[in-house]
Regions:
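Conserved SAM-binding motif I beta-strand of class I
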Residues: 73-78
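A generic alpha-to-beta junction signature in SAM-dependent methyltransferases
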Residues: 43-44, 68-69, 149-150
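Class I SAM-dependent methyltransferase Rossmann-like catalytic core
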Residues: 1-45
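C-terminal substrate-binding/active-site "lid" region of AdoMet-derived donor-dependent transferases
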Residues: 51, 83, 127-185
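S-adenosyl-L-methionine
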Residues: 79-123
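Glycine-centered, small-residue-biased loops immediately flanking beta-strands
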Residues: 48, 72, 154
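Conserved SAM-binding loop of SAM-dependent methyltransferases across substrates and taxa
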Residues: 57-70
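Conserved class I S-adenosyl-L-methionine
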Residues: 45-56
Length: 185
């Protein structure tokens, strides 16, 4: 990492500061908020069952918790722990590898789900080809969960690295869902 890159990570930008001031562990919360506002993504939370894949540090989970306001249920899964302030009586956190059969079984036992979200990102290497391939694997895994555990008519939001192959992933999603749109919040 160059000195310029490392400085960018050392100093929080406007969105990071805003997220922290609102109690969110990361600025990624604004992606899901904008998706929800633009597409009315999150249904009535009263009976909603949500799955957050690759959830740590927990901004998307916390957004769902606040949106649900104690109703519905959220299942979040990640290799890493959620931030300490991401908690609720209607939250089940599973720490583990999404590829692990026991984790899949546990997540499946708590479904089916009305929405599946994934802001999962691989540990980046700096090699665009490697990082993109790893990101695509995470998207494919999220699509497997959605295809297996999402209720008919359910919604999914997933982060895809912009690399040229996102059109192929969108095409795959169009075969799975009533509609699929690329959107850059």
């Amino acid at each position: 990492m160059s000195a310029k890159q490392s400085k960018a990570y050392a100093e929080p930008d406007f969105w990071s500061k805003k997220a922290f001031s609102e109690g969110y562990p990361a600025r990624s919360v604004y992606k899901l908020r904008e998706i929800d506002e633009k597409f009315d993504f999150i249904p009535n939370p009263k009976n909603c069952n949500a799955l957050d894949l690759g959830a740590a540090p927990g901004s998307w989970t916390l957004f769902l918790l606040r949106k649900f306001n104690g109703e519905g249920h959220i299942v979040s899964c990640d290799l890493n722990e959620l931030a300490k302030n991401v908690k609720g009586d209607n939250l089940t956190f599973i720490q583990g590898d999404l590829n692990d059969a026991a984790v899949r079984e546990k997540i499946g036992s708590l479904g089916p789900y009305d929405i599946v979200v994934s802001d999962a990102a691989p540990l980046t290497t700096g090699n665009r080809i490697v990082d993109t391939a790893r990101s695509e694997q995470l998207v494919d895994m999220a699509l497997w969960y959605a295809g297996t555990m999402l209720k008919t008519g359910g919604n999914m939001a997933v982060k895809i690295f912009q690399n040229g192959s996102q059109q192929a992933l969108l095409q795959k999603m169009r075969g799975m869902f009533e509609s699929a749109k690329g959107f850059k919040p």
